[in-house]
Each structure stands twice: as structure tokens, then as C-alpha cells.
Amino acid sequence: MSFRPSQRAQRIEPFYVMEMAKHAAAMQTQGGPPMIRLNIGEPDFTAPLLVREAAERAIREGRTQYTHACGLPELRERISGWYASRFGVSVPASRIIVTAGASAALQLACLALLDEGDEVLMPDPCYPCNRQFVAAAGARAVLLPASAQARFQLDAQHVQAAWGARTRGVLLASPSNPTGTSIAADELARLHAAVQGREGFTLVDEIYLGLSFDAAYGQSALRLSPDIISINSFSKYFCMTGWRLGWMVVPPRMAQLVEQLAQHLYILLIKYLLQL
């Protein structure tokens, strides 16, 4: 049987980190030389005992059925409380969507915000998967060279100069992978104001925010505006990379739209893990 791959699928580039991990695992399976694997960004220890015991208990008690497409209400409330206690930010649980890792959150955001031919401004260098999520939605990532002097982040001037007729928003990470740098709150506020002036969206990947130990950079973008979309994950904060648990915080008017997408795309998420 022959078939024609979609142009969208052919536009997607391999994730070379995972390709390297696959080949390294094959070498080990085939009795290759000992190696220290530095290819994947994850802790070398597993989730805390408390987490593992909670998952085992949920399985024993048969709590393995479908849940709400946005995640367990109790979990969303706990995440809301976490924002209040850690960052002093009020984030209603109704704005929190639990996802199959941060990657699923980014995919949902791109599908909710982008149409074929749209463009998204991103700093270069940036996390390579992010531009693939944009491409999978039929849009195009416009990479803007960012200098060390600018902490490898975009600023309002970048946005104003590069904004075009098909530009829909800005996607950045703070702290950034691979550079490790963050954008200062005042600079992000100016950038977001520039984006709002163009009626666009500001999407901030914050999965490494727990590794920011400087008060000037360790604050969530959600402190600045309820219109900012934030992506986060249990992977780095709680050593749960393989569990595929993440979440996104969206503006109130966007919550129902994302929920409808999640109902179709992620109803088979392993929901018992959300009972932790």
C-alpha cells in the first residue's frame, strides 16, 4: 500500500537529542563501551518516594478511569495554591489545564492560536522542539538572533522591528534551554506591552523556573498579566520526566477553547497519575 506523507509531517525535523539517546541506548544494548550520557536534560534520580507511593495507591484503589479533560479539579486547585505560596500570584484553577507534559501544553497552545501561514517570533538560539510545535500547527517560527548582551532573549525592540502581517505572537523560554538565561521582569513587561499593542499573544515556557535562584529572574511571568500564557511541568521541579505531566495557564477567555481541543487529543492521558 502506498501513501503520500503530508507536507506538515515532512516539515517537521527530527529531535536530535532523542535520536542521539536512541542510538546510545542501542549501543548499550549491543554491549558497546561504557558511557556517561549527557544528552537528555533530566535528573539522574527518580521521583520522590511520596510521589511513587501515591501512584501505587491510586492503582491499587482502582482510580484509573477518565477524568475531566483539564485534569482533576483537586490537582488544579493544588497547582493554584502552589502559585500563591511560591510566587504570590493568584491563578484561579479555572485557568489551569493539566497536560501530558509541557510538550502537550505547547501543542495545545499552538493549535488554539495559530492558523496555516501564521508566524511566531522566537529568539535564536532556542529550544528546538518549540519551533516544531509551531510548524505542526501549519505556522512558521521566525527566529531572531539574540545576543549574549541581551541574555539571549528578545526585547520589545526585537518585536516591533520584526512584527509582520502574519505575525501572531511571541514564544520564549525563561529560563531558556539551551542558554540557561532568563528575561528580566521589566523587560518582559515591555515586550508583552509591545505584543499586546499588536493584538498578539505572549507565550512563556517556564519549565526551568525552579532553577532560578536570583530574585530578579525567579518570578513567574504570570505576575505581570493574566493575558500571558505560561507553560510548566512536573518534570524538572519534581524529578518526574518520564511521568509526562505538565500544565498550562491560559487567559480566562482561552480556557474553554483549549479544553475542547484537549477533549479530543488527550482523553487517553494516563489520568491516574493526576491523583498525586
What do these predicted regions represent?
Residues 112-134:
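Conserved PLP-anchoring active-site segment centered on the Schiff-base-forming lysine
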Residues 90-96, 116-119, 166, 226-227:
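Short acidic capping loops at alpha-helix termini that bridge into adjacent secondary structure
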Residues 27-31, 137, 197-198:
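Helix C-cap/helix->beta junction micro-motif
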Residues 142, 148-216:
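Active-site phosphate-binding strand-loop segment of PLP-dependent enzymes
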Residues 224-276:
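Conserved core segment of the aminotransferase class I/II
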Residues 136-142:
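A short helix-loop-beta submotif of the ANL/AMP-binding
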